[in-house]
């Protein structure tokens, strides 16, 4: 087991070192613009690193993995499409179409789909029937794009995905599904080299890398894959509503932002600077402070989900809490300028009090 984790880490880490000059040579880099305020052209190779690390783990633990060929094929397609998008910018509708095809393959060949939503509406199981197939496709696209869209500041994608994988792993251990739990923690090991270099650890900003669409879509797909394995079928280790709490921050942020864009008559896929991390930085927080605060909030949400499972809290109550959280978040987004102005005022007041002291 330890050998697999070591090889996973080394595979991901060495891929970053190997791919840096190649990415710069072929133009697989992220250049600053009106939305992206980083310095210089940053290699978009985190996705390749994650894929290689994940592949190393799969090859060493092949017999323990579920549907390995289908999963590896799916993430390879996402990797290739993501790299093409990172280099040339392809249509978001084309990307969504490919994601839908992969979801259909997951349903047809892997028999992974949303059959029920648990008891989110009362003391009865909400069975979906054939409509569950459509909802599965939509949920797959949503999960992929939620993690893709939240990747806006250093460390955030690595932090949020690690929170999700740790939370899933804990619940899987509780249910004695050690193979899936082991993989969940191995995914964190595969992300770790990117996470460190994205934050400038240990080589500084000179070796900084970004995940890119290739990596963020791979993470989103992997999370929905594990969640489907964990929430559906008999004896599932977690309820579907718990999955909402585990990925609450990226999911709510995506839905709220897309709704706001549609309400303004814009494309839901049109980039802007209205995500939660942008608003926090506008309020005066640094990029590092925003990353830590959002990751902490995600950890709290995931903890609520875990505690709901451990203490058998009614699913409809957990769902009601999630809906309340969503509306509170949406309300804050629509009044972002007031909130950011109030936060800046409080920070200035606190600074004056500190200086007087």
Swiss-Prot record:
It catalyses: di-trans,octa-cis-undecaprenyl phosphate + UDP-N-acetyl-alpha-D-glucosamine = N-acetyl-alpha-D-glucosaminyl-di-trans,octa-cis-undecaprenyl diphosphate + UMP. Signal peptide: none annotated. It is an enzyme of class 2 (transferase). Its cofactor is Mg(2+); Mn(2+). It is a multi-pass membrane protein. Its main location: membrane. It is found in: Cell inner membrane. One of its GO terms (biological process) is cell wall macromolecule biosynthetic process. The chain crosses the membrane at residues 40-60, 64-84, 124-144, 183-203, 209-229, 238-258, 291-311. CDD domains: GT_WecA_like. Pathway: Bacterial outer membrane biogenesis; LPS O-antigen biosynthesis. The keyword Acyltransferase does not apply. One of its GO terms (molecular function) is glycosyltransferase activity. The keyword Iron-sulfur does not apply. Belongs to the glycosyltransferase 4 family. WecA subfamily. HAMAP family: WecA_Gammaproteo. Catalyzes the transfer of the GlcNAc-1-phosphate moiety from UDP-GlcNAc onto the carrier lipid undecaprenyl phosphate (C55-P), yielding GlcNAc-pyrophosphoryl-undecaprenyl (GlcNAc-PP-C55). This is Undecaprenyl-phosphate alpha-N-acetylglucosaminyl 1-phosphate transferase. The lineage of its organism: Bacteria, Pseudomonadati, Pseudomonadota, Gammaproteobacteria, Pasteurellales. The gene is wecA.
């Amino acid at each position: 087991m330890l050998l697999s984790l070591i090889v996973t880490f080394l595979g991901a880490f060495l891929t970053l070192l190997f791919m840096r000059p190649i990415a710069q040579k072929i133009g697989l880099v992220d250049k600053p613009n009106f939305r992206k305020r980083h310095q210089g052209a940053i290699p978009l190779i985190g996705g390749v690193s994650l894929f290689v690390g994940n592949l190393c783990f799969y090859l060493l633990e092949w017999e323990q993995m579920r549907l390995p060929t289908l999963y590896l094929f799916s993430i390879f397609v996402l990797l290739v499409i993501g790299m093409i998008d990172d280099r040339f910018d392809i249509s978001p509708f084309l990307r969504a179409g490919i994601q839908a095809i992969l979801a259909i393959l997951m349903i047809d060949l892997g028999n992974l789909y949303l059959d029920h939503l648990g008891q989110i509406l009362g003391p009865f199981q909400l069975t979906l029937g054939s409509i569950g197939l459509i909802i599965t496709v939509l949920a797959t696209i949503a999960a992929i794009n939620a993690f893709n869209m939240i990747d806006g500041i250093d460390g955030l994608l690595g932090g949020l995905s690690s929170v999700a994988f740790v939370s899933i792993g804990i619940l899987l251990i509780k249910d004695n599904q050690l193979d899936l739990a082991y993989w969940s923690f191995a995914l964190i090991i595969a992300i770790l080299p990117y996470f460190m270099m994205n934050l400038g650890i240990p080589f500084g900003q000179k070796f900084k890398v970004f995940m890119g669409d290739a990596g963020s879509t791979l993470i989103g797909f992997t999370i929905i894959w594990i969640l489907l394995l964990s929430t559906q079928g008999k004896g599932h280790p977690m309820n579907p509503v718990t999955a909402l709490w585990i990925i609450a921050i990226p999911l709510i942020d995506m839905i709220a932002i897309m709704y706001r864009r549609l309400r303004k008559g814009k494309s839901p896929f049109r980039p802007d600077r209205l995500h939660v991390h942008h608003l926090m930085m506008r309020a005066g927080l640094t990029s590092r402070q925003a990353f830590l605060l959002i990751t902490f909030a995600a950890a709290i949400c995931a903890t609520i989900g875990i505690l709901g499972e451990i203490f058998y809290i009614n699913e409809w109550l957990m769902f009601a809490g999630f809906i309340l959280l969503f509306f509170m978040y949406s309300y804050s987004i629509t009044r972002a300028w007031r909130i950011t102005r109030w936060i800046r005022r409080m920070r200035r007041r606190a600074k004056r009090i500190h200086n007087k002291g």
